[in-house]
From Swiss-Prot:
Gene Ontology CC terms: extracellular space
GO-annotated biological processes: glucose metabolic process
UniProt keyword annotation of Secreted present: yes
UniProt lineage: Eukaryota, Metazoa, Chordata, Craniata, Vertebrata
Classification via Gene3D superfamilies: Insulin-like
Predominant localisation class: secreted
Localization per record: Secreted
Pfam family, one: Insulin
The name this protein goes by in its record: Insulin
Keyword Disulfide bond: yes
Domain of life: Eukaryota
Cited function: Insulin decreases blood glucose concentration. It increases cell permeability to monosaccharides, amino acids and fatty acids. It accelerates glycolysis, the pentose phosphate cycle, and glycogen synthesis in liver.
PANTHER family registered for this protein in UniProt: INSULIN (PTHR11454:SF9), INSULIN/INSULIN GROWTH FACTOR (PTHR11454)
Oligomer and partners: Heterodimer of a B chain and an A chain linked by two disulfide bonds.
Length: 51
């Protein structure tokens, strides 16, 4: 999958998709917004935020 910019609700939706029942840890201060919204991130990187 190509890297993509994901912001706000799009980012949360992507986390739900990637993490599924595991759930995820969403903290704007955790670097995910900087990584995925200000820059681009891959689904592989998103998985790092799953529980």
């Amino acid at each position: 999958a190509a890297n993509q910019r994901l912001c706000g609700s799009h980012l949360v939706d992507a986390l739900y998709l990637v993490c599924g029942e595991r759930g995820f840890f969403y903290s704007p201060k955790g670097g995910i917004v900087e990584q995925c919204c200000h820059n681009t991130c891959s689904l592989y990187q998103l998985e790092n935020y799953c529980n």
